[in-house]
Amino acid sequence: MFGSSNNNPFGQSSISSPFGTQTHSLFGQTNNNASNNPFATKPFGTSTPFGAQTGSSMFGGTSTGVFGAPQTSSPFGASPQAFGSSTQAFGASSTPSFGSSNSPFGGTSTFGQKSFGLSTPQSSPFGSTTQQSQPAFGNSTFGSSTPFGASTTPAFGASSTPAFGVSNTSGFGATNTPGFGATNTTGFGGSSTPGFGASSTPAFGSTNTPAFGASSTPLFGSSSSPAFGASPAPAFGSSGNAFGNNTFSSGGAFGSSSTPTFGASNTSAFGASSSPSFNFGSSPAFGQSTSAFGSSSFGSTQSSLGSTPSPFGAQGAQASTSTFGGQSTIGGQQGGSRVIPYAPTTDTASGTESKSERLQSISAMPAHKGKNMEELRWEDYQRGDKGGQRSTGQSPEGAGFGVTNSQPSIFSTSPAFSQTPVNPTNPFSQTTPTSNTNFSPSFSQPTTPSFGQPTTPSFRSTVSNTTSVFGSSSSLTTNTSQPLGSSIFGSTPAHGSTPGFSIGGFNNSQSSPLFGSNPSFAQNTTPAFSQTSPLFGQNTTPALGQSSSVFGQNTNPALVQSNTFSTPSTGFGNTFSSSSSLTTSISPFGQITPAVTPFQSAQPTQPLGAFGFNNFGQTQIANTTDIAGAMGTFSQGNFKQQPALGNSAVMQPTPVTNPFGTLPALPQISIAQGGNSPSIQYGISSMPVVDKPAPVRVSPLLTSRHLLQRRVRLPTRKYRPSDDGPKVPFFSDEEENSSTPKADAFFIPRENPRALFIRPVERVKSEHPKDSPTPLQENGKRSNGVTNGANHETKDNGAIREAPPVKVNQKQNGTHENHGGDKNGSHSSPSGADIESLMPKLHHSEYFTEPRIQELAAKERVEQGYCKRVKDFVVGRHGYGSIKFLGETDVCRLDLEMVVQFKNREVNVYMDESKKPPVGQGLNKPAVVTLLNIKCMDKKTGTQVMEGERLDKYKEMLKRKAGEQGAQFVSYDPVNGEWTFKVEHFSSYKLGDEYDV
């Protein structure tokens, strides 16, 4: 197949053997018997080891010896030839394969290549033009006619390929390819390709090939012509513009500027103003430009005295439209309703016959002609403007970066030196006073632009170290009490640390970080004239006439333009506002800025957190703010905070409003130094025991004007478990809300204004023996002498609680005598508390009584003992039924819901048999019961049967059912579903659902 002389597919000499052996063995062995098989089974201990060949070779050899033994014949079908001989390899015939000659491994190449290590000249299969003798590897010395790597046979179409360093004829289309370092012949289309280091192609930094726009490209450090628009850059160490040299450059690149010397003023960068030299009291910081991109030089104006433009679209003192970033230019607002400020524009209503109808619409403005309101809203939505404050960098005139206008900006700063700025709506901006006072003009107010870029304002250049948002400090020219680089996250300087390069200026104090960390030891947190207020609720008191606000809260300004009775309003829908005079203004993040009074300087107040967790154990300085001090947002008082002396302003109290409206404001009633918090409870303890309390007449002469003060004074109802069911009450007998006035309640309401003395609501009730006078002691106190053996208990407060009370009259001789005390006890109701305790308990609104409990209390007040003999008393539940107790019934202190329970078509009275009184007593007496929802229903159709034979059968069933339960049938109303029957005593009466027809 591959050049062999036989038909054997692998070129063997034998026809029948597949691998060229002389016998019919599988792998060229002479025979396949067991004696010659090296892998055949042999007995243990034979002389022939495993794998030894006694006969013919396994792979074509005549004899295969033991491993390592010499062989008598060549294995694998080869004759004993040396390595690299010309005898064919395994299975090869005399006729060579395609394109090869008769050579073993290492012989002549079959595809035109020479043998490895042989020097016999061979012919190329591709018809190359030259056939040189090629020495073996290592036979020729380096640098001979055919060095290492050179080939006598050139590439396709090439005349010859020179070796490394040899100049010879070049390749495709080239006249010659020079060696490494050659100087003449170039490649394809090239005029001249010089060697390495030749002068035709300049080296790096040479002057032949110039850069874009430059005359030549100088070497590193040379002083040749610069690039396009750039100034010549001097070499390192040369005198072109060395450090400290004040030489002006000829011209810079587009928007760039040359670096000025140390302290020298020079032409600034694109749009930035120049930096003056380093002098005492210089306006900017050391080596700092007063404006940034698009702020000063390019298309904006320098602001007035002391005011420095902000780099991020800030508002300065002068309103001018920037050329770069102006309206309908780069960075401007291209659409929406805020292209220009809204101005009321009158338009004629279209589509009406009458032209007198006019309306005002934003679409009528000249800037919005051809657009309706929906289109403007869509444009606003496309720009992400959904109302509220303006977004970052947005200006109402459509100005981009660097526009100085008179509208509020997010990153705006305020001008200095007695200029009235526009009221900023910036949540991140530093607040400045809205007006100047006549006593302390707020000049030298520093302006703090965006993201902590410090700019130093005007008069005498007194710089306050404004803390950067990203932790970078401002300038080197300030005299501050904190080190450079204070961050927003509360790093506090060491005590007495002062940076270098401190210059003139007065009262430079530190500004606080963004998130309100407190300064270190002995740091002054009360700033001077040039101090700005922090952002998020740091407790710093601003200077005279300076008001601080975070999110649009208008605090009380300084003396000149502030109304004494003005009301502060906030940006949160008046949730934090309170109408007060001379009160503190509560900031949303816990900063309280006291209003400045004409007769008192600003006092540092106590900081209040956003959620009312106030300071512990601090003493508030006397001020003319709210009487009880400032309260937290959620009406939590300052724990153990005692006002200092002098806090005795008598004025109308101002309750601090609650932002969520869930809890009423605290009443502040005091005319002298007393407690700070009234006796008011919140939560479950302040809930009334009943839904509809008894109408107790309260007509005090001196009471609190606050409604809450009067409401908590209402007495509560007691629960008497002695004569009720086993239900566990919510308020037990000992858990009533005491209505005893606390020590800080200066005005106590009186039950009866005609009384001769003021006494608490919970009066002392005692029982005295019949006809036994009780003399008064010398100190005017009554003795607690009791002779009838009644149970009594003395509480800690000295009050005696006994039952039943008796009416006590005072004689002229100063003794008290009991009139009408008997064994049963007569209930006297001289006060509303006693009447309330006699009323039956009815908590759920679904239950009702006839007469109502309010009517019972009114009749008991007029006629004592009325509740013991209520005629035809009715108790019921709406939608379930009612019970009419015949005759007179004693309803005093009954918990009706524990005794009477209505369910669907069922009523139970005294379910607990152990609590049931004998027949005729309590509610276990004759009564007429009416159950509702007793209707004759057809089970198949689900309709109500109103007449017919089926209704008569249903009525007969009700009569039979009443008789079975010991009741007497009275009537049945099929329309209303009322079943009325009479009982002599009470148990459980019901009608199940199985009695429907």
Swiss-Prot record:
Family designation: Belongs to the nucleoporin GLFG family.
Comment block on domains: Contains FG repeats mediating the translocation through the NPC by interacting with transport factors.
Sequence repeats: 2-3, 10-11, 19-20, 27-28, 44-45, 50-51, 59-60, 67-68, 76-77, 83-84, 90-91, 98-99, 105-106, 111-112, 116-117, 126-127, 137-138, 142-143, 148-149, 156-157, 164-165, 172-173, 180-181, 188-189, 196-197, 204-205, 212-213, 220-221, 228-229, 236-237, 243-244, 254-255, 262-263, 270-271, 280-281, 286-287, 293-294, 298-299, 312-313, 324-325, 401-402, 451-452, 470-471, 489-490, 515-516, 536-537, 551-552, 572-573, 589-590, 611-612, 616-617, 660-661
Annotated GO CC locations: nuclear envelope; nuclear pore
Segments forming a coiled coil: none
Assigned keywords, A-Z: mRNA transport, Nuclear pore complex, Nucleus, Protein transport, Repeat, Translocation, Transport
Lineage: superkingdom: Eukaryota
Organism: Arabidopsis thaliana
Name of the molecule in the record: Nuclear pore complex protein NUP98B
Biased composition (Basic and acidic residues): 371-388, 760-771, 814-825
InterPro entries (UniProt xref): Nucleoporin_S59-like, Nup98_auto-Pept-S59_dom, Nup98_auto-Pept-S59_dom_sf
Miscellaneous comment as given in the Swiss-Prot or TrEMBL entry: Unlike in mammals and yeast, NUP96 and NUP98 are not translated as a polyprotein.
Record region (52 X 2 AA repeats of F-G): 2-661
Record field: compositional bias (Low complexity): 54-68, 89-112, 293-308, 423-451, 461-479
Keyword presence, Coiled coil: no
One annotated GO molecular function: structural constituent of nuclear pore
Subunit structure: Part of the nuclear pore complex (NPC). The NPC has an eight-fold symmetrical structure comprising a central transport channel and two rings, the cytoplasmic and nuclear rings, to which eight filaments are attached. The cytoplasmic filaments have loose ends, while the nuclear filaments are joined in a distal ring, forming a nuclear basket. NPCs are highly dynamic in configuration and composition, and can be devided in 3 subcomplexes, the NUP62 subcomplex, the NUP107-160 subcomplex and the NUP93 subcomplex, containing approximately 30 different nucleoporin proteins.
Region (Disordered): 1-144, 293-552, 714-744, 758-836
Peptidase S59 domain sequence ranges: 844-986
Ranges of compositional bias, category Polar residues: 1-53, 70-88, 116-144, 345-363, 403-422, 480-490, 505-552, 774-791
Primary residence: nucleus
Subcellular localization(s) per the UniProt record: Nucleus, Nuclear pore complex
GO-annotated biological processes: cellular response to hypoxia; mRNA transport; photoperiodism, flowering; protein transport
